[in-house]
From Swiss-Prot:
Domain free text: The J domain is necessary and sufficient to stimulate DnaK ATPase activity. Zinc center 1 plays an important role in the autonomous, DnaK-independent chaperone activity of DnaJ. Zinc center 2 is essential for interaction with DnaK and for DnaJ activity.
Keywords associated with the record: Chaperone, Cytoplasm, DNA replication, Metal-binding, Repeat, Stress response, Zinc, Zinc-finger
The protein, known as: Chaperone protein DnaJ
Compartments, record wording: Cytoplasm
Cofactor(s) the protein needs: Zn(2+)
Zinc finger (CR-type): 140-222
Amino acid sequence: MAEKRDYYDVLGVGRDASDDEIKKAYRKLSKKYHPDINKAPDAEAKFKEVTEAYEALSDPQKRAAYDQYGHAGMNGGFGGGAGAGQGFGGFGGGAEGFGGFDDIFSSFFGGGARQQPNGPRQGSDLQYRMDLKFEEAVFGKETKISYSREAECHTCHGSGAKPGTSAETCHKCHGAGQIQVERQTPLGRMMSRETCDVCGGTGKEIKSKCDTCHGTGREEERHTVKVKVPAGVEDGQQMRLQGQGEAGSNGGPYGDLFIVFRVAPSDEFERDGAQIFVEVPISFVQAALGDEIEVNTVHGPVKLKIPAGTQTNTVFRLRGKGAPKLHGTGNGDQNVTVNVVTPKTLNSKQRDALKAFAVASGDSVNPQDSNLFDKILNKKYKK
């Protein structure tokens, strides 16, 4: 298995890169390697690598963990980036995934803060990747998703015991969930505390196990949930659905489901938050004399007035024609960049007209000069 590359190297940014620099790098690379656009054999693998790096560095807590511990810091809390490679995966249990210092010291010395291993525990969180079209991310949508999860057993209702029976206090740990173990070490005899090997730390012993779940109290199910994707979501953002994760243990609540959005790029538009960007070609004549053109927006076509003497790369703003603001009201703007296109071929009438224009402008024109239009544009229309 190939060694993972440094996340900063993957995105091509320095370790002191700002959030905005990381975001811009991700946008550029995700569009470059998106499987819908790039058909190279390794495009999908590179897209996943870029996505995994962005997920780590765009989150302040994950980035801090990565800066301190490297890839090991990612494995402790988030199960190796399951969302980048499959539909859903476990997030892990937050700090529990790393283990606490209390656990480390207490396992050797039998002291420290005692946990309650047989108490209620919340179920694991799950992650689901939802692919969205560009327009779906802009305007939102309602849909249903299905995924597999560990749910409470419908037969024993999570107890793990056969109906009509109940779990008993563990005969070995007496309900504590842990046992004291004495070991001989180079420092002498030492006592340590370990999870009970009979009850698995629950403090309860099931002698008549449920036939459905075989004593686990849980069973796998295909779960369906309705999701309302808010208008204005962006690639890489996530939404939390409380209680839609996996079943807890010992009466604990269900975990949560985190939906991570993957937005396909548009062939026509670029987007940064609520701002939409598009480039539109116009002719030399339209730029010189002015015109009214039709421009596509995410809301439909609109009219845009081009003033006489417009220069190439001029940006016009269409207010309120951008994407809805995710955390606010109203829409952003659409920014239209016009590019003046120089014709590559001319008929005789067009050449004569431009020669006359050059004479009227005081230009000395060599008819064989292939840079005729560059001369005119540079002299008459350059800022």
